[in-house]
């Protein structure tokens, strides 16, 4: 049976649309619906590669997990990844379409709208219920003509809309009323309810205000979602929640690169007992860390130059000499090498830049982007898995330091001879299997900290989605929402 699509739109960015959409996905999955997520256009440096080798935003991966289905490219047909110099890489249905100047977006608009509709039609054929998510504010009147992800999608899908507003940042009533007022009459008719998100306090004291806002906008408030401390992956690095340690366990420092991407690579480490994760904003922040991670980058050469100019290069080399564990992922792996060559100008005008020299690799960028899921093996024969998203190829200059290889011999990771500096192209390496847990337990053993056996990461995430679903059921009128999808 086919049901009417439901759409979550926001009064602003970071109001919690992605998480509420994930909660809806989990709710409908547990109710027995064949449900899938869809977001026409995502702007994010945080991406994932599907089994088919297609690149999509991670928010829809989280939502697909909540639905217990495999992520597919049609769940996020347009992904825009900002680069340096006001450039944006445009990914359409999982593949790189072009890199454009941000101001040329209008020229692509018609084509992108066609592709978004095509993807929606495809996903609608495969599933009975689609939970749609918008992007940013749905009432940006200067963007109405070029809108793809918000009311344009609601119209294409003929979806009813639930408006999500964030009370934690203040001004929630003005943002709700202002958003509704700025919509056209046709758009307002689609809005069938409001969810007030991130509420702190007792609901009974808030009820009178809810009734007042209903009187003003003539739309029901379906409930208030409380501010919660669940471990649900955030969409972008601006809102990342890192888990700080108590000074008695493992301290992991993430070097905060200006063009950092795929920050979710280290999320799973933060759930491990006695592990704290924090950003290193300056070189001194590395001094007390037990492990340093250099994450992925959307502009590796620029970030490498930043490390040199900010003093991070010297600090990282010193920490390496002192035996500290340093781990580079993707762009971080390339940065740890001897040299990066960009003869084709893939990233910009700089054609060559010396790396930190901590790993024996030379990286050459090329026009083709590698996007695929991988299964590989380390030196001890342990399986590691994840996905690749990168331009270029890194060639070992000392084969005795090869650390991770695929069965076909393709090198995906290196270490130094002292075996305290490691790098790999594999995103998600800490998520799958027990690689991350083994690494942390090795550190714990060295520091005389009790080792721990953690719950499987997939099971852990499912438990978090279940708790999120419980919060939704307890606080939001989901019977009303179910009536909407059956109307």
UniProtKB/Swiss-Prot annotation:
One of its GO terms (molecular function) is ABC-type vitamin B12 transporter activity. Catalyzes amidations at positions B, D, E, and G on adenosylcobyrinic A,C-diamide. NH(2) groups are provided by glutamine, and one molecule of ATP is hydrogenolyzed for each amidation. CDD domains: CobQ_N, GATase1_CobQ. NCBIfam families: cobQ, PRK00784.1. It comes from the Bacteria. This is Cobyric acid synthase. The active site is at residues 330, 427. Pathway: Cofactor biosynthesis; adenosylcobalamin biosynthesis. HAMAP family: CobQ (MF_00028). Residues 249-435 form the GATase cobBQ-type domain. Belongs to the CobB/CobQ family. CobQ subfamily. GO terms for biological process: cobalamin biosynthetic process. Pfam families: CbiA, GATase_3. Keywords: Cobalamin biosynthesis, Glutamine amidotransferase. The gene is cobQ.
